[in-house]
């Protein structure tokens, strides 16, 4: 049993748990200078222009020892260079430094999820590729872990990379989750430190004939990014099948977008799974089984014409495809997909 909503090319830029795997004794739940001459730089500072130049001079030390002023100028210059290096061309993000963005609005989504809309500078896009991620942290000393270190977590926006003026995150609040609890407590006008992008899988149109996706809970967000990109490009002929599992029907994220456009584009098949199916719900119940994957996802025999994406809580990822390696590496392919004969280069773990 499955639902086959199809996504329209009109999705464009406006649209954008408990996954379980049948594995032995495993049940997972869907629930981050220039060289100095040593001389005085006073003429250079004053040459910056009028009052602004004098103000800059005072800001750098005024009548202090010329060497101190020179050192301060070099420090400021290095800081500006570092910022320029990290800035993504034409984008609001910086991959090397946290930039503070202001929360414009927070929209409740369901009983435990909300969409947080952050303002970008006027006319700016985020400056990231499809399915890229960012890391976030509270500003100042707002949120620390048990060791006193900043809590930093990764997130994937649900807005497309071409969205101008704002960047949206759909955040599910998990019990005991420090960052999700913090983000849900934010109010319009509050700021959040965001750094990125972190490059993930570099999707290219028509690179594969078929893509299979297995997601649980908030692991839907990178999948949605890829789906948005394909749906907005009529020339991309890639077929996509998404298996998306949650605890209850109310936990399904972005369902409105999927269902609203379900009948308009046969490139997409969406298969919902729940712990227990309510009466009349079209989907599968319980585990993601080998038979389910065999029936609906592109098979290993397609070789480099197929790709399988996996995203969700660590227990889910481990059961489906083996856990990720250190420092964000892919790690060894194990779990259900390995058992079915998929090769490591056919699978990507977000």
Swiss-Prot record:
An example Gene Ontology molecular-function term: cytochrome-b5 reductase activity, acting on NAD(P)H
InterPro entries: CBR-like, Cbr1-like_FAD-bd_dom, FAD-bd_FR_type, Flavoprot_Pyr_Nucl_cyt_Rdtase, FNR_nucleotide-bd, OxRdtase_FAD/NAD-bd, Riboflavin_synthase-like_b-brl
Keywords linked to the UniProt accession: FAD, Flavoprotein, Membrane, Mitochondrion, Mitochondrion outer membrane, NAD, Oxidoreductase, Transmembrane, Transmembrane helix
Chief place where the protein resides: mitochondrion
Annotated CDD domains: cyt_b5_reduct_like
Family: Belongs to the flavoprotein pyridine nucleotide cytochrome reductase family.
Described function: May mediate the reduction of outer membrane cytochrome b5.
Protein name per its UniProtKB record: NADH-cytochrome b5 reductase 2
Organism of origin: Mycosarcoma maydis
Gene: MCR1
């Amino acid at each position: 049993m499955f639902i086959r909503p199809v996504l329209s090319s009109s999705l464009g830029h406006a649209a954008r748990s408990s996954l379980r795997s049948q594995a032995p004794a495993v049940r997972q739940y869907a629930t981050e200078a220039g060289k100095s001459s040593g001389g005085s730089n006073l003429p250079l500072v004053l040459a910056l222009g009028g009052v602004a130049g004098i103000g800059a001079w005072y800001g750098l030390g005024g009548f202090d020892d010329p060497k101190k002023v020179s050192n301060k100028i070099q420090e400021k210059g290095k800081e500006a260079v570092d910022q320029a290096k990290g800035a993504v061309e034409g984008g609001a993000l910086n991959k090397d430094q946290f930039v503070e963005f202001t929360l414009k609005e927070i929209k409740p989504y369901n009983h435990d999820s909300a969409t947080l809309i952050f303002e970008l500078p006027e006319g700016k896009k985020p400056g990231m590729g499809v399915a890229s991620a960012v890391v976030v942290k509270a500003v100042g000393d707002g949120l620390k872990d048990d060791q006193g270190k900043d809590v930093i977590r990764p997130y994937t926006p649900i807005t497309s990379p071409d969205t101008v003026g704002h960047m949206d995150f759909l955040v599910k609040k998990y019990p005991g989750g420090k960052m999700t609890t913090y983000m849900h407590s934010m109010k319009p006008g509050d700021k959040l430190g965001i750094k990125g992008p972190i490059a993930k899988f570099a999707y290219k149109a028509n690179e594969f004939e078929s893509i299979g996706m297995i997601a649980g809970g908030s692991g839907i967000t990178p999948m949605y990014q890829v789906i948005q990109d394909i749906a907005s490009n009529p020339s991309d002929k890639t077929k996509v099948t998404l298996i998306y599992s949650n605890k209850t029907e109310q936990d399904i994220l972005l369902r409105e977008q999927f269902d609203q456009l379900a009948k308009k584009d046969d490139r997409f098949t969406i298969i919902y799974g729940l712990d227990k199916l309510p009466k009349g719900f079209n989907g599968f119940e319980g585990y993601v089984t080998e038979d389910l994957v065999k029936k609906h996802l592109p098979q290993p025999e397609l070789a480099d014409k197929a790709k399988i994406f996996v995203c969700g809580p660590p227990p889910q990822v481990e059961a489906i495809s083996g856990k990720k390696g250190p420092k964000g590496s892919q790690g060894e392919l194990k779990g259900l997909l390995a058992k079915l004969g998929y090769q490591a280069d056919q699978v990507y773990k977000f």
